[in-house]
């Protein structure tokens, strides 16, 4: 069915974006150093939560078209405003105490709220999930574990790259296998 095809593509895109996010998290300290030099070295602690924020925005962009389709754009405005309020309140509480690094984490929390809210709104409106809940949960837990590992071992290139390879290679092979299988079935 058309819905099943959309769900399949959404899962494939989510896996692809997760692979990118995991790779970027592993590379982020070196990327910060290459792009900013030693004077921006503390930025390596901001990169990982910002990469996770980008993933949350990706999830939002996968599910929000359902709200447009059902012409319920008021929900988009409400969700955006709610996430903005969460971000402002958290920034007010944490930035003065913990500095600019806190801003990355408050942004992450706000974007997670944004994505979760719209995920459930879209599911309520359509009666189905564009992205299966179990898939999203698995990938989010995987990303959070990889983020924690990358932060704990931020000074160890070998551990970060090895962990990235252990996760990304099987995910990439699985995705490619599914894409080739699909291509062969469709001629």
Where are these regions (language model features)?
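Membrane-interface helix-loop junctions in multi-pass transport and translocation proteins
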Residues: 74, 80-116, 151-166
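Alpha-helical transmembrane segments
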Residues: 63-71, 119-133
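Hydrophobic alpha-helical interface/terminus motif in multipass membrane transporters
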Residues: 31-35, 67, 94, 109, ...
């Amino acid at each position: 069915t058309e819905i099943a095809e959309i769900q399949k593509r959404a899962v494939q895109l989510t896996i692809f974006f997760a692979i990118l996010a995991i790779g970027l998290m592993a590379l982020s300290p070196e990327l910060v150093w290459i792009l900013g030099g030693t004077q921006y070295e503390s930025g390596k602690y901001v990169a990982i939560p910002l990469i996770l924020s980008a993933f949350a925005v990706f999830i939002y962009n996968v599910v929000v078209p359902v709200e447009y389709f059902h012409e319920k754009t008021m929900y988009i405005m409400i969700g955006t405003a709610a996430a903005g309020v969460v971000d402002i309140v958290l920034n007010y509480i944490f930035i003065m105490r913990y500095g600019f690094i806190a801003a990355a984490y408050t942004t992450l929390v706000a974007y997670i709220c944004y994505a979760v809210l719209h995920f459930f709104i879209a599911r309520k409106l359509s009666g189905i999930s564009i992205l299966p809940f179990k898939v999203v949960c698995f990938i989010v837990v995987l990303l959070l574990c990889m983020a924690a590992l990358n932060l704990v071992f931020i000074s160890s290139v070998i551990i970060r790259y090895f962990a990235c390879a252990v996760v990304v290679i099987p995910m990439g092979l699985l995705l490619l296998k599914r894409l080739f299988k699909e291509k062969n079935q469709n001629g």
